[in-house]
């Protein structure tokens, strides 16, 4: 399988995982993954049809009466997929990214971008990273 085919496969898996985590009809998903060799975080927001209001992923268990443990397991699967995506870059002798913006729509439009910022060296905490992209 070529690098592009592997990317496409992982992109599909990530989009499907997130889609399966949202128990209602949604329109757009905005995802950020921050991963380095020491760990990381992944979070996403989504919109519902007819609304531009962002719905934060951590509200899903409470809002839709879903087990927190089940949701955490799904989130860990999502995190693992982003780690797999980062590892693919290493396997291809490419610089591993530290930030991945992964946005997609219900219609199948996908926008993926990567950054190579040393967040720790620059002193950005979680909210600083989020504000960097606002």
What positions do the PLM features span?
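Extended intrinsically disordered, low-complexity coil regions enriched in Ser, Thr, Gly, Ala
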Residues: 37-64, 113-123
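Elongated alpha-helical scaffolds
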Residues: 94-98
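Short, hydrophobic/π-rich interface segment
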Residues: 65-87
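Negatively charged, low-complexity tracts enriched in Asp/Glu with abundant Ser/Thr
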Residues: 9, 13, 60-71
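Long compositionally biased, domain-poor regions of proteins
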Residues: 3-52, 80-93
């Amino acid at each position: 399988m070529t690098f592009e085919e592997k990317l496409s496969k992982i992109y599909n898996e990530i989009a499907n995982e997130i889609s399966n985590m949202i128990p209602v009809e949604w329109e757009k998903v905005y995802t950020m993954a921050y991963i380095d060799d020491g760990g990381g975080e992944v979070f996403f927001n989504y919109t519902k049809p007819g609304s531009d209001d962002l719905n934060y992923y951590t509200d899903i268990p409470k809002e839709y009466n879903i087990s927190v443990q089940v949701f955490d397991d799904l989130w860990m699967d999502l995190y693992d997929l982003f780690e797999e995506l980062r590892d693919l870059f290493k396997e291809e002798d490419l610089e591993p990214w530290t930030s991945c913006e992964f946005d997609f729509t219900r219609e199948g439009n996908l926008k993926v971008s990567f950054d190579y910022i040393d967040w720790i060296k620059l002193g950005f905490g979680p909210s600083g990273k989020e504000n960097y992209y606002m």
